[in-house]
Amino acid sequence: MTGTYRPADALAGGAPIGDLGAELRLRGLATELRLGELGPGAVAAVLGRGLPGADVPEELARLVHRRTDGVPLFVVQLLQAWTDAGELRPADGRWELTPGPDGGRQEVPDDLRRLLELQLERLDADDLAMLETAAVSGIEFAAATAASGGAGTLEAVEGRCAALARHGRFLRATGPVAWPDGTVSAGFRFAHDLHRTVLYERIPAGRRARLHIAVADRLERGYGPAAATHAAELAGHLLAGYDHARAAPHLQAAATQAMGRSAPREAIQYLESLLDALTRLPEGPERDEAELLAQMTLGPALTATRGFASPEVEAAYTRAHELCVALDRPHELVLVLHGLAAVAEFRARYHRSEALLTRILALGTSDLALEAHELLACSTFHQGAAARSFGYAMRGLALYDEGADHTYLAPYGEHPAVSCHYWAALALWFLGRPDTALEHAEQARELATTHPYSLASAEVQLAYLHQYRGEAEAALAWAGRALATASGHGFPIRAVQAAILGGWALAMTSADSGGVEQLRSGLAGYLATGAELDHPYYLGLLADALATTTGPSEGLVVVEEAIRLVGTERPFYYLPELHRIRGDLLAREGRADQAAAAYARAIELAAGHGTRSAELRAALHRCRVQDRSPTEADRAHLRQLYDQFEEGFGTPDLVAAKALLEDG
């Protein structure tokens, strides 16, 4: 004979089954087989057998284990409920969990809910009230929190919880919990998350809200001065209790803490809840002050997750600007103007960006002077003014104070000194100082090691620099590292930049069409953020890659589109290189005279920009045009440019130039 029973139910019902089983075992007449909880691997195996015909994703197995704690009955019933409701279905060769027809998802199967509610109904009123407060507190709780709902004194609640835990009913003991106010009480955890869910959902809405407030009050007193470090927990209870005024500062604190941990997606969730809560408060200066701080925090968070030029970033800073003006907040205005300047910069609106930054400096405050110089370095670099860019970057670094509070970093989430170093690096390459450029790029990375977003930026810029230097293998390595950092932390703009540079480098090192596809995909992702800043540059990389993999004709179409995008009304740092690439492609088609003209245009533009490295590269390629020997004038010009260099003699261009000059 085989029989089953639950020890906790037998104890609750007063049935003698436990004693009977012990006596039978003592006489050797029975064997007890305890069915333990399943681990994550066992749950995955159960799902694999119960869901044939498609793969079971690891995240689905983890979710089921988390919801059921591995209780076999719960696993089977939850799986059955989701499949019966059509919420779990195969798609593209794998099982996917989707919302049901009503837009929600069945958290507790009906049969299982009835079973759990029967167990709850066997409790006396005091135990049930105590467990309801505990359910409001969370999956883990202190007895002191459970006592806040009026279910008795701390000692009485602690004793009741301990009794339930001893009998294996609903709770497990976890050890003592000490709060900063001196309170020490026993800690407990719900045996199963489904128990807590059923308990929580059966509490009437009004009582549930009051319990959340009671729990928040007790936690706030218990945490005392340390309450700020528990801001997210307190905000959750206060929102659930509809106390939006008290929840607001905790949500702001939680968002600020998330940004400090480089968790911008988490910060956005808190800030969206905060902005919603503020709409429920009376209008007035106090509400506007809170919204201003929220929008100023939202700008950098959105920048990190959606890109510099996204409409959401512009909307956050635009609203913050309106509030700064209304509240007369000059300090905050400087931060907001910088954010708007960054948006303009990454949409290639250089004049607007420069005007906003000049306005910041004209305000005569030291606030964000470093950041303003950093963004001016970016703006002037993209306009082809490498010398001005380097000057702004170095003035910014002169303002950098290592001991200053850089909690917010730049208003778009990046360490300003890191940015100054890498703009100095990129400008220096164009100015003909490739080795010093590399030193600045490496300093940027060293400074960024403790801040993931700045680290992703510094690694991307190292990939840029090696691309400029013509070192495809090094560019590929740094692009790979940048992609790993950016993808791991959820920084899409840096991820797509790394993908573009990595695609170019892959095409140049292996002539693999996969590099071109990666480059195209990255470019599409870049444009999807709304950014236009480097669009012509990326098209130049695509043309260069196409020349290696598919031949010159398609590359010519792409590079001519890049030149058209730059137009005639604005300078652009990479325009000399675009004409040089066009010359290379024309030369490969055997059109030597047209190629020479393209090189001449590249040389003219580079000389006008004062960008010595770009001028030397164009002169070098002009000397190597197919079916055409370099003229003495071309060779003399290359010699003149080569002799101006004082460093970088190991870089590919200078090595090739030296070989060509010595060969002649």
Which ranges hold each PLM region?
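Alpha-helical scaffold segments of alpha-solenoid architecture
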Residues: 488, 495-496, 500-568, 575-576, ...
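Short secondary-structure boundary elements
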Residues: 3, 35-269, 273-282, 546
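Acidic, glycine-rich loop-and-beta core segments that form the ion-binding/anion-interacting portion
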Residues: 444-523
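Sensor-1/coupling segment of RecA-like P-loop NTPase cores
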Residues: 1-33
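Inter-helical turn/loop elements of alpha-helical hairpins
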Residues: 9-10, 172, 198-399, 425-439, ...
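Generic long, charged, amphipathic alpha-helical segments
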Residues: 554-612
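Short, flexible, glycine-rich and Lys/Arg-enriched loop motifs at helix boundaries
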Residues: 279-287, 401-416
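Generic helix N-cap/helix-start motif at coil->alpha-helix transitions
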Residues: 226-230, 247-248, 370, 417-420, ...
